[in-house]
Amino acid sequence: MTNIRKTHPLMKIINHSLIDLPAPSNISAWWNFGSLLGLCLGIQIITGLFLAMHYTSDTLTAFSSVTHICRDVNYGWIIRYMHANGASMFFICLFLHVGRGIYYGSYTYSETWNIGILLLFAVMATAFMGYVLPWGQMSFWGATVITNLLSAIPYIGTDLVQWIWGGFSVDKATLTRFFAFHFILPFIIAALVMVHLLFLHETGSNNPTGIISDADKIPFHPYYTIKDALGFLLLISLLLTLVLFSPDLLGDPDNYTPANPLNTPPHIKPEWYFLFAYAILRSIPNKLGGVLALVLSIAILAVLPLLHTSKQRSMMFRPISQTLFWILVADLFTLTWIGGQPVEHPFIIIGQLASFLYFFLILILMPTSSLIENKLLKW
């Protein structure tokens, strides 16, 4: 009799995705982040669901409902901090996952890559709206500043902002709709993840060499299931260490002050994972220009397949491109640092130079270096 996992309609899907899936024999730990992102999404949905049971999306009670969760609900504090720090873990895994894709040329699977970009935008939108919900000072002013950027859109900008706010300022209507969107988006993300995997399994995974590995495949289970399990263990250990020892390490102390529309915090800044984009936004003196640069800082990923000029897929055997890649990583760290600094000399000029370098590296230097490396192959 044939094994049920190969015949049952539902089991068959799971089998082809997790058990009998042919996987390259040489994929490194950099390929672990896909499954880790799945784990992060699962943690966020479960902890978020339990938080939603006790949270109230009203301007008068939102802040105190979060306090109530931490003080009065059984293990509410750990659920709340796992959710808050889980978001940081999510973004760490996301950035490493995207970085892996750039380094090893995974973006040549254009459908998988483009859905990945959509996922990145969706996760960023979800995280932004989630940050507004505790209704602290940084929640309120972050929401005000970021939504107000849409007013830079010509002609319809102001109307659009007021439509999103549900009034003439960030208020009760805004908080309620942000809660609704924050609740529904993770499920849309989960659906997009399925599409992301569907397209990935059409082609199979890339590998560090960037060479087609059809002749050398191994079953996903037990090799990569055990490898993923180790990754899960490490991620959960790291998350719990953060939650139990320094839960507020990555947060902003201003968010422990209830939202006050009459008192602006001295430095309005988003969570750490948005600081690089925030630095790019602030580096352009023009409002519309800044908004365009902000969107392009992520959307630029979509043009990577078009800018791939190398004869090799991966950067594994391309030292010049490798150097530029690591300069790009250092540049992103610089932007993240600048995003958290006040708008004053010398931070302004550093931010402008780092923003210029970011686009210059991706659009000009990296494609040019690939062409040079193609020439070097003939030596």
Swiss-Prot record:
Descriptive protein name: Cytochrome b
Other noteworthy facts: Heme 1 (or BL or b562) is low-potential and absorbs at about 562 nm, and heme 2 (or BH or b566) is high-potential and absorbs at about 566 nm.
Record has Cell inner membrane as a keyword: no
Gene assigned in the entry: MT-CYB
Annotated residues for binding of heme b b566: H97, H196
Subunit and partners: The cytochrome bc1 complex contains 11 subunits: 3 respiratory subunits (MT-CYB, CYC1 and UQCRFS1), 2 core proteins (UQCRC1 and UQCRC2) and 6 low-molecular weight proteins (UQCRH/QCR6, UQCRB/QCR7, UQCRQ/QCR8, UQCR10/QCR9, UQCR11/QCR10 and a cleavage product of UQCRFS1). This cytochrome bc1 complex then forms a dimer.
Taxonomic source organism: Ochotona ladacensis
Keywords attached to this entry: Electron transport, Heme, Iron, Membrane, Metal-binding, Mitochondrion, Mitochondrion inner membrane, Respiratory chain, Transmembrane, Transmembrane helix, Transport, Ubiquinone
Function: Component of the ubiquinol-cytochrome c reductase complex (complex III or cytochrome b-c1 complex) that is part of the mitochondrial respiratory chain. The b-c1 complex mediates electron transfer from ubiquinol to cytochrome c. Contributes to the generation of a proton gradient across the mitochondrial membrane that is then used for ATP synthesis.
SUPFAM superfamilies: a domain/subunit of cytochrome bc1 complex (Ubiquinol-cytochrome c reductase) (SSF81648), Transmembrane di-heme cytochromes (SSF81342)
Record: residues binding a ubiquinone: H201
